Design a protein with these regions (language model features):
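Extended, largely alpha-helical regulatory/partner-binding modules appended to the mid-to-C-terminal parts
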Residues: 76-89, 100, 104-110, 117-120, ...
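Short, solvent-exposed coil/turn linker segments
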Residues: 13, 95, 235, 279, ...
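Serine/threonine-rich low-complexity intrinsically disordered regions
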Residues: 32, 64-67, 301, 385, ...
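Residue-level marker of regulatory loop/turn positions in helix-turn-helix DNA-binding domains and
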Residues: 67, 243, 247, 406-409, ...
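P-loop/Walker A NTP-binding region and its immediately flanking N-terminal helices
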Residues: 1-173
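Long, low-complexity intrinsically disordered regions
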Residues: 390-424
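General helical structural elements
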Residues: 11, 50, 59, 113, ...
Length: 424
């Protein structure tokens, strides 16, 4: 039986935590200066390190060399609270989701009176603290306000607003946050290197995106991909199928067809989405993500685009550069708006395929869009056909909800006249 990745690589010190410097640095400072409070409230999304940080804080407080911001890792307390340790008698973890009543609070209050069995402090970690009832919190109120010198409380919750206000006011509140993509990508790459696992280009970007900034969710998905791989290499095809994302080749096909005005190719790709059992909503969401990337590529230099779009292979970035050039800024903006509007319309829709195909029809026919944005897209398309370039740079974004400006209409008329003139 193999232990899950998120358990094997659970941090044991604050220095090993990623993306939570707003929490770890103040806590380490408090430990170094001996200004530790009697009660803490850790809040934030699931899987971002709240319970892990509570255990690390308990190790720091009860370390034989402590209180210290860096536990020694060899004393009995550190060993018992380490990754895979048996647990300490003086560190009590309570699942508040199932121990949330008055009787449980009274039992905790009675246990807090007794001195620690061996260590410096008796520490109570209440996970899912928002599940404690008002009566349970009220039973704990006096103890949390004025605990014995040997007692520390750490509350962990995903919903701090549901924790009784009088309890919150007696704690030091540290909000955790989701980990940004860049450090998460670096972390999972390092983990794969330590595990001796090879991943094909683009796989880790999908894993980080699917994890949504939660280290635990990200490692669970990576663990699933590694377990389902026949060799020590995680393939892109299997990752796309398992995570439910649209294959990059299919997105390239649709984008190329839209850029070239190829209705047959675009509708054939949409049909393949349905025939292969993919979710049309997921396809539209992935298409919007790709259009966002193309807008970044079109608006910035290759170096800046590579810095923003981390994890995308260089050959794919080059291909996206060619796709962005085939559209133009105004056309990309218009298409992205239509795709975003369709994604909103598909929420709760009974026929998502119909919305997908209608979206493609609107995207492929700019003349159906009578807004100023649509007029600019038509002008840009005509200028590209006759080889006219914009020497003054990209125009300012027009205000929506107004009739096309006279300058836009005049420019469109000139472009149409130039297109109709016979070529020399």
């Amino acid at each position: 039986m193999v232990t899950a990745l998120y358990r094997r690589y659970r941090p044991e010190t604050f220095a090993e935590m990623i993306g939570q410097s707003q929490v770890t640095e103040p806590l380490m400072t408090a430990l170094r200066t001996d200004r530790v409070n009697h009660a803490y409230l850790f809040s934030g999304p699931r899987g971002c390190g709240k319970t892990t940080s509570a255990r690390i804080l308990a190790r720091c407080l009860n370390c034989a060399e402590g209180p210290t911001d860096t536990p020694c890792g060899v004393c009995p307390s550190c060993v018992e609270l380490s990754r895979g340790g048996s647990g300490s008698l003086d560190v009590v973890e309570i699942d508040a989701a199932s121990h949330n009543g008055v009787d449980d609070a009274r039992d905790l209050r009675e246990r807090a009176v007794f001195a620690p069995a061996r260590d410096r402090y008796k520490i109570f970690i209440l996970d899912e603290a928002h599940m404690v009832t008002s009566q349970g919190f009220n039973a704990l109120l006096k103890l949390v306000e004025e605990p014995p010198d040997h007692v520390k409380f750490i509350f962990a919750t995903t919903e701090p607003d549901k924790v009784l206000g009088t309890i919150r006011s007696r704690t030091h509140h540290y909000p955790f946050r989701l980990v940004p993509p860049a450090p998460m990508l670096e972390y999972v790459q390092k983990l794969c290197d330590e595990e001796g696992v090879q991943v094909e280009p683009g796989v880790l970007s999908l894993v980080v995106r699917a994890g949504g900034g939660s280290p635990r969710d990200t490692l669970s998905l990576l663990d699933q991909l590694i377990a389902g791989s026949e060799s020590s290499t995680v393939g892109y095809e299997r990752a796309v199928a398992l995570l439910g994302y649209t294959h990059g080749a299919l997105l390239d096909e649709v984008v190329d067809a839209i850029g070239a005005g190829d209705a047959s190719g675009a509708f054939a790709a949409a049909d393949r989405v349905v025939q292969t059992g993919q979710d049309p909503r997921r396809f539209v969401e992935d298409l919007l993500e790709r259009l966002r990337d193309l807008i970044v590529v079109a608006a910035t230099s290759p170096e800046a685009a590579a810095a923003v779009l981390r994890g995308i292979p260089s050959d794919e970035l080059a291909r996206m550069g060619a796709q962005a050039a085939a559209f133009g800024s105004a056309e990309l903006s218009r298409v992205a708006d239509l795709v975003s509007q369709t994604l909103t319309e598909m929420t709760g829709a009974t026929s998502p395929r119909l919305h997908l195909e209608l979206m493609l029809a609107r995207v492929l026919v700019p003349s159906a869009d009578d807004s100023e944005r649509g007029a600019l897209a038509r002008v840009e398309r005509l200028e590209r056909r006759i080889g006219v370039t914009d020497a003054a740079g990209p125009a300012a974004e027009p205000e929506t909800g107004r009739a096309p400006a006279p300058a836009v209409a005049a420019a469109e008329s000139r472009a149409q006249a130039a297109e109709s003139r016979p070529q020399a």
